[in-house]
């Protein structure tokens, strides 16, 4: 599963880009 996170991905996840949600930029993590 993939998630949008602030401020960064959790350990063991990879960042594949960004999400724009509620006026903020989130890390897109899988």
From Swiss-Prot:
Compartment annotation: Secreted
Keywords tagged on the record: Antibiotic, Antimicrobial, Defensin, Disulfide bond, Fungicide, Secreted
InterPro entries linked to this entry: Alpha-defensin_C, Beta/alpha-defensin_C
GO terms for biological process, alphabetical: defense response to bacterium; defense response to fungus; killing of cells of another organism
Domain of life (superkingdom): Eukaryota
Keyword Mitochondrion in annotation: no
S-S bridge residues: 2-30, 4-19, 9-29
Keyword Disulfide bond among UniProt keywords: yes
Annotated GO CC locations: extracellular region
SMART domains: DEFSN
Chain's role: Has bacteriostatic activity against L.monocytogenes, E.coli and S.aureus, microbicidial activity against L.monocytogenes and S.aureus and antifungal activity against C.neoformans.
Family: Belongs to the alpha-defensin family.
Protein's UniProt name: Neutrophil defensin 2
Source organism of the structure: Macaca mulatta
């Amino acid at each position: 599963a993939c998630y949008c996170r602030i401020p960064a991905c959790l350990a063991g996840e990879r960042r594949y880009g960004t999400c724009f949600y509620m006026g903020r930029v989130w890390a897109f993590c899988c």
